[in-house]
Amino acid sequence: MKKIFSKKGESPLGSFARRQRSSAGGGGEPGEGAYSQPGYHVRDRDLGKIHKAASAGNVAKVQQILLLRKNGLNDRDKMNRTALHLACANGHPEVVTLLVDRKCQLNVCDNENRTALMKAVQCQEEKCATILLEHGADPNLADVHGNTALHYAVYNEDISVATKLLLYDANIEAKNKDDLTPLLLAVSGKKQQMVEFLIKKKANVNAVDKLESSHQLISEYKEERIPKHSSQNSNSVDESSEDSLSRLSGKPGVDDSWPTSDDEDLNFDTKNVPKPSLAKLMTASQQSRKNLEATYGTVRTGNRTLFEDRDSDSQDEVVVESLPTTSIKVQCFSHPTYQSPDLLPKPSHKSLANPGLMKEEPTKPGIAKKENGIDIIESAPLEQTNNDNLTYVDEVHKNNRSDMMSALGLGQEEDIESPWDSESISENFPQKYVDPLAGAADGKEKNIGNEQAEDVFYIPSCMSGSRNFKMAKLEDTRNVGMPVAHMESPERYLHLKPTIEMKDSVPNKAGGMKDVQTSKAAEHDLEVASEEEQEREGSENNQPQVEEERKKHRNNEMEVSANIHDGATDDAEDDDDDDGLIQKRKSGETDHQQFPRKENKEYASSGPALQMKEVKSTEKEKRTSKESVNSPVFGKASLLTGGLLQVDDDSSLSEIDEDEGRPTKKTSNEKNKVKNQIQSMDDVDDLTQSSETASEDCELPHSSYKNFMLLIEQLGMECKDSVSLLKIQDAALSCERLLELKKNHCELLTVKIKKMEDKVNVLQRELSETKEIKSQLEHQKVEWERELCSLRFSLNQEEEKRRNADTLYEKIREQLRRKEEQYRKEVEVKQQLELSLQTLEMELRTVKSNLNQVVQERNDAQRQLSREQNARMLQDGILTNHLSKQKEIEMAQKKMNSENSHSHEEEKDLSHKNSMLQEEIAMLRLEIDTIKNQNQEKEKKCFEDLKIVKEKNEDLQKTIKQNEETLTQTISQYNGRLSVLTAENAMLNSKLENEKQSKERLEAEVESYHSRLAAAIHDRDQSETSKRELELAFQRARDECSRLQDKMNFDVSNLKDNNEILSQQLFKTESKLNSLEIEFHHTRDALREKTLGLERVQKDLSQTQCQMKEMEQKYQNEQVKVNKYIGKQESVEERLSQLQSENMLLRQQLDDAHNKADNKEKTVINIQDQFHAIVQKLQAESEKQSLLLEERNKELISECNHLKERQYQYENEKAEREVVVRQLQQELADTLKKQSMSEASLEVTSRYRINLEDETQDLKKKLGQIRNQLQEAQDRHTEAVRCAEKMQDHKQKLEKDNAKLKVTVKKQMDKIEELQKNLLNANLSEDEKEQLKKLMELKQSLECNLDQEMKKNVELEREITGFKNLLKMTRKKLNEYENGEFSFHGDLKTSQFEMDIQINKLKHKIDDLTAELETAGSKCLHLDTKNQILQEELLSMKTVQKKCEKLQKNKKKLEQEVINLRSHIERNMVELGQVKQYKQEIEERARQEIAEKLKEVNLFLQAQAASQENLEQFRENNFASMKSQMELRIKDLESELSKIKTSQEDFNKTELEKYKQLYLEELKVRKSLSSKLTKTNERLAEVNTKLLVEKQQSRSLFTTLTTRPVMEPPCVGNLNNSLDLNRKLIPRENLVISTSNPRASNNSMENYLSKMQQELEKNITRELKEAAAELESGSIASPLGSTDESNLNQDLVWKASREYVQVLKKNYMI
């Protein structure tokens, strides 16, 4: 049968702690559970820069990485971990705060689907968890196992974190994949404080896991029951007349946990059982066998039968009365679900005084508990049910089997085909049988063995260490109708374990096997299995009672072989036998009719109930052993009366059934019987007791025979018939012979039993010795394993240290490289700076040379100026001379004229000369002017050039000073940097030296570690050698266990294969899940980015729209401001033009807003009227006071101010009107909205109409009249629609006319403005008259148009009133139609409903049309108002006409005034012309000055730009020079470094050569030492041969050689230890040849010695070769240990080893 053991001390979380993950899929180690290893297994190659910095807690580095954007905030490593995950797992709250402030994603999951909050809670990092919770991390996310952060807090028993999680709305009822809430998890983990805390927080106490078990109830029940039961064994015996009352005893076992899958009957958590290892299976099977004891089913005989009916509620006593048949007592047991069958109840029985009646006391159900407080077993009450429950249970467990298989972690194939399934139930389950004698009513003594029917009863089997229970199929071949539940698989029933057996006074050995007749081969297999189980039990044998029962069972089998098939006999043989000696078996129809019903009832009732029954009292066992021997003795006696007894040579009995006459199966040989009995320590006493009881019981028939003879003698006194007397005497003699034969047979059996007891004692001693040796071996094995584990741990630690050292070395190297690179960069920067300095110096030189050139040019210009001034002076002198000459000539001419007045010819000549001279003078003056202009221009240019040059000089001097300052600063900075660099270089050199020293130290440590490793390997090799020796010593024991181990290995391999397949599938699914999760995360990130982008775009759009609006508002405001400023300027220049500009602004506003146009036009007309009034007043004033123009002007100014005030008033009125207009616009918008709503409703109604048209086709016949009326209404509706359309057309026409009128009004206004302008001019008299005429004509035309529009409006109003009347009529008709429709009844109801819908639709349409009409009416009203406004405008125009007539009159008066004013204006115009010329000259001068200044500014800017460029070039040159210098220095340093490296390499090479020389010298020394060792070994071998000769001459050596071969050579260990050699010592059995028969003769001794010498020589040569090879390879080896015990040889070896060790110490410092 399959035995599966669960681990003790596992986590109570089921699959929670046992679920394994692959290292590739998850973040942790392989085999890591849900709660094991809370941190991450970090590898540098998997991490990015930000991940390394976050895991190390380096906040500055994380900031730097994020600033440089080397990694993102949410970047993931190969395990999908972010920097936040690693910071939380390693407990760095500063890094967490930094990442959270940068707004990283908080709910990102790793490969195990764990968030950073989960890792913080799992690693007990409270600060990190609080930071995450405060920033909005989700506490209700679940990982791969379904665990939330609260689960991890509960598991760690961290109440503070749990309170914080609950504060941030963590789900207290969250379930993981095992359906465990945090409360259930705390209960299962025995975390009392956490449970109390969760209950305070109102956790659900009635929560149920997958198995529908409440840990709350279990824990409460456990707390109540723990103090009531103790762990001691209670063995009490209460014996009454014939039966004993067995009491309960409980022994808590160790590691006897048995998970069950029957979750409906037991409310316990199932555990996923891991793969069982062989060692654990062996130990667990031993311990479970110690803890489990079997119960049994008793066969009771007599006239009455007793059936057990156990009900915990009623506990009634049931007494069943029947024919004399066998009674069946069925006891079904469930195996304990969790690890300790503590209290197993057994019913107590009493035999009543009444001989035929037996009662059963009510028994209390026992409750079994586990010591660790988790697993509790309650025995449920038994209930009697129908026979169908067997099959029902079978089907239920077929369904539950898959769940149980998954819980066990086993495959179905291994479940079905198990090597342990061949074991029988009776083999594994010791049984006790009570077979009491029931007294008959007539007082006759009856033999129970003959009277007892061979029936089926249930033997409850609790297999030792087995989770699987089998029910044997044992069916009677003659009783087909008996219902027996067949089991399909060994693991189907975990709580129902009844087995059915047929008994004939002795329990059958092979009752649990499927085959009906057991064979000898099967018995042999069972015996082997029993021996293997005995060997597995070890040295501890705490409960011998189980084995005693097993012994008794086998003793019974040894004596009598039961026949399984004799379950029924014929009714014909039950009637007329009154002998009392030969009484046939009774198996009538009553037997088989009664039995199956009761048996099935018992079975069905015991199925769901989980009762644990156990019998442990030793006295009870002894008593049952006696009774079990009694019954076969009587059975044999009854069979011997039939004359069919056979006594074989092997002392085995064969029995022939009386009913069918066929022989039953023989028992096995005595050897097999002996093997069956070698399984207990204390079975000798029981066997002796059983033999005694057998001999005593054999005397019982003899006493009955004497009583019979007395009866014959009494009859003989009365009876005279001699023939009958003779017959009676013959019968009596035959009975006496049979009894004597029986006694002889019993004596033979007693002799055999004694022999067997002796053998058993010997075997028991051997077994005890082997068990002790085995326990010692196991202890040694455990110790060796511990040492190996410690060595491995130390090796791992050393490897980790080495790795850490390597990583430190690499980090230091990287730091050095970085510093070197920085140094190189700084050197390059210095070189660049030096180059820039050089370039700046060059620029300075060039600037100085340019300055010298400019100075020279300036000097040249000054020289030229002086020359030109001299030339100018000369020209002035010449001109003065010419003038003086002319004057003299004129004077002379005058004199000559006066003197020579008569000489006309001379005068002509002189005049001609004068003209010529004057022309020359004019030419000279022109030349002088041009020369002056040129000189002036040149002087200006020179002065400008001088100024520029001075400015340039100043700038250059400033730049030179700045450059010098910067140069000094840069030189000082670079000197400081150079000093820092030199210091850093020195530091780096010191660090290099330190690193070299540390490297040397590390190398020394590595060498020491190597030496330690070698020592550890040496120790391990020694341990392995000792192990091998021990294993050779116990090969026999292992050979016996090899079969079981092979089977176990096969099972384990199957399990491993299945687990590997499952793990691969899991890995695949996990990888798929991870990939899907990664894709999901990527898509989610992409979506987030897209949404963020959209939001940004929307924000940008909104911002741009807002900016646009602001810009428009600003633009409008600016436009308004500009317009205002323009108006003000015009008002300052001319008051009339101001009014016109304001009118223009008003017109522009009218153009912008069409709705405001009318109001603005009114204001314009009013302003015009006022203007005309002002003009009239001016004309009157001009008529009255034409002379006082100034006073009039003042009055006009005051009047203009009044006009402005009025204008402001009008503007206020205009604003109010604009508000009114806005309200009207809002009303229009509301009406438009209503119209749109009505249109939408119209569309909806049209859709509904389309749907209803299909339905209305059927109703067309019935509703013809209604349709006609509807058509009329529709016609009216269409007419109304047409009218509305006409109205809209009229409205459009009116709007067009209004637009035309507005255009004409605008034209008129333009003309009025032109008139006003013309008024100002003087020449406007005739033109104005013509324009006035035109205006009059236009006014008349406007009046005509207005009259026509008024007529049209009147007509439209009439049409509207007509439409309204029509609508009213249609409404009335529709109402009448509706009233008329109410009269229709019956069939028209449906049609009425549909028509109502249509009519309602039409009503809605009509309402919409009325609304449209109302809107049209409102529009008409609006048009009326507009017409009224136009009429008002016409009236105003009439007033304008009147004013124009008055103006014409005033014009005539003004014309005269204008004539007077013109003269005054002409004067003013002359003055104005002069002023304008003066203004123009000033403006030109200003422009010239501005242009000159701009030129100067441009030149200055250009000069500045050039100087900046020069500066930049200078800096670049300086920088390049510094860079070059730094590069040169770096090259020098590199060359120095290369020299140092080369020197180091040379030094290393020299050192290596020295070491090589030393090594060669050591090799030579070793060779010499090896040669010495070989010599000493040869001497030792010679001494060994002598010693062997001496020893083998003694007789003691021969005796030891005969018993067992020498397994190991003597004195080997001493040599091995003294030499400190590392070579394995392999023991060889062929060193000494064991001689079985030593001879005393000299020839045999000589032959033996010669053989021994040959073998020793071979071994010595072999060992010498191996030693030489090992010495050459450098490993330490030990030569073959000889058997010399003399002091001389030991001294030699000791000296040699000491010398060798000293040499090693000198050379290697060991």
From Swiss-Prot:
Matches recorded under SMART domains: ANK (SM00248)
Coiled coil: 529-566, 743-873, 905-1472, 1517-1587, 1649-1674
InterPro entries assigned: Ankyrin_repeat_domain, Ankyrin_rpt, Ankyrin_rpt-contain_sf, CC144C-like_CC_dom, DUF3496
Alphabetically ordered keywords of this record: ANK repeat, Coiled coil, Phosphoprotein, Repeat
Pfam families documented for this protein: Ank (PF00023), Ank_2 (PF12796), CCDC144C (PF14915), DUF3496 (PF12001)
GO cellular component annotations of the record: centrosome
Swiss-Prot/TrEMBL GO biological process terms: negative regulation of fat cell differentiation
Start and end residues of each stretch annotated as Disordered: 1-41, 222-274, 504-630, 650-698, 892-912
Basic and acidic residues bias spans: 586-602, 613-626, 661-673
Amino acid composition bias (Acidic residues), ranges on this chain: 569-580, 650-660
Superkingdom as given in the UniProt entry: Eukaryota
ANK repeats: 45-75, 79-108, 112-141, 145-174, 178-207
Modification sites for Phosphoserine: 11, 15, 241, 261, 489, 530, 631
Involvement in disease: Thrombocytopenia 2: A form of thrombocytopenia, a hematologic disorder defined by a decrease in the number of platelets in circulating blood, resulting in the potential for increased bleeding and decreased ability for clotting.
Function, as annotated: Acts as a regulator of adipogenesis. Involved in the regulation of the feeding behavior.
Quaternary structure (record): Interacts with TRIO. Interacts with GPS2. Interacts with CCDC85B. Interacts with HMMR.
Protein name: Ankyrin repeat domain-containing protein 26
Organism: Homo sapiens
